[in-house]
Amino acid sequence: MRNDVHLGHKARKRFGQNFLNDPYIIDGIVSAINPRPGQNLVEIGPGLGAITEPVGREVDKFTVIELDRDLAERLRNHPELADKLTIHEGDAMRFDFTQLVKPNNKLRIFGNLPYNISTPLMFHLFEFHKDIQDMHFMLQKEVVNRLAAGPGSKAYGRLTVMAQYYCKVVPVLEVPPTAFVPPPKVDSAVVRLVPYEELPHPAKDLRLLERVCREGFNQRRKTVRNCYKALISAEVLEELGVNPSMRPENLTLQQFVAMANWLADNPQH
């Protein structure tokens, strides 16, 4: 049997499809999500329903977003799920999640995300952080390491800072390639992202925070003084509690925000 065919569906490379088929891992993911009736659950990329089916056994209604027309059609005709699902056929990267929000019922989003779009998709979802209760995603293990990293580590970068700006990041479980058909070439992991009710370190202008992150991590081996010399003087860095001789990869989220907020208050620079 071909190793890229699962339940009669051939995995499509352009959609980055790898189908989960390990019952032990599936149980672990569903337990982590802990779906309950009445919750506003949204699955991105339900695929062949490996997580969709067990979640469907716990709840009466939920929403799925699926780009692959054949898979969306399959779900519409699913004997157990058809009546429970609201199916949005299309690209989650362009989806306006505010249309799913209900009064006092924030979104609980989950999915086995295609690894080729996981980072831009998370940046898209962060825009809706006020409407989201939590997110559970299967990702490349390397991406989960980046999301959860601390300053000074190799995995620490722009994605880390922006994810931790919006969310508490909790790695949940590791998943070997053998849990999928076809097996990906990388290890995977499940992560829980819980958006803060109140941002712990709010930026006055997000574009400036993204800019200081981008400039810092593009030159992570330079000193902070050299990296930001066109933007912020060494004296101001000292005032902000930033040591000019350290490297950008050692700066905390709080320090990146302090620099961005200084730039927002001093726009002539």
From Swiss-Prot:
Localization recorded for this chain is: Cytoplasm
What EC number(s) is this enzyme filed under? 2.1.1.182
Q: What keywords tag this UniProt record?
A: Cytoplasm, Methyltransferase, RNA-binding, rRNA processing, S-adenosyl-L-methionine, Transferase
Coiled-coil stretches, from where to where?
A: none
- GO CC aspect terms: cytosol
GO MF terms listed in the record are: 16S rRNA (adenine(1518)-N(6)/adenine(1519)-N(6))-dimethyltransferase activity; RNA binding
Q: What class of enzyme is it?
A: transferase
Q: Reaction(s) catalyzed by this protein? A: adenosine(1518)/adenosine(1519) in 16S rRNA + 4 S-adenosyl-L-methionine = N(6)-dimethyladenosine(1518)/N(6)-dimethyladenosine(1519) in 16S rRNA + 4 S-adenosyl-L-homocysteine + 4 H(+)
**What InterPro entries does the record point to?**
KsgA/Erm (IPR001737), rRNA_Ade_diMease-like_C (IPR023165), rRNA_Ade_Mease_Trfase_CS (IPR020596), rRNA_Ade_methylase_Trfase_N (IPR020598), rRNA_adenine_dimethylase (IPR011530), SAM-dependent_MTases_sf (IPR029063)
- On whether Nuclease is a keyword of this UniProt record, the answer is no
Q: Where is S-adenosyl-L-methionine bound in this sequence? A: 18, 20, 45, 66, 91, 112
- Record Pfam families: RrnaAD
Q: What does this protein do?
A: Specifically dimethylates two adjacent adenosines (A1518 and A1519) in the loop of a conserved hairpin near the 3'-end of 16S rRNA in the 30S particle. May play a critical role in biogenesis of 30S subunits.
Name the family the entry cites.
Belongs to the class I-like SAM-binding methyltransferase superfamily. rRNA adenine N(6)-methyltransferase family. RsmA subfamily.
Which protein is depicted? Ribosomal RNA small subunit methyltransferase A
Q: Which lineage? A: Bacteria, Pseudomonadati, Pseudomonadota, Gammaproteobacteria, Vibrionales
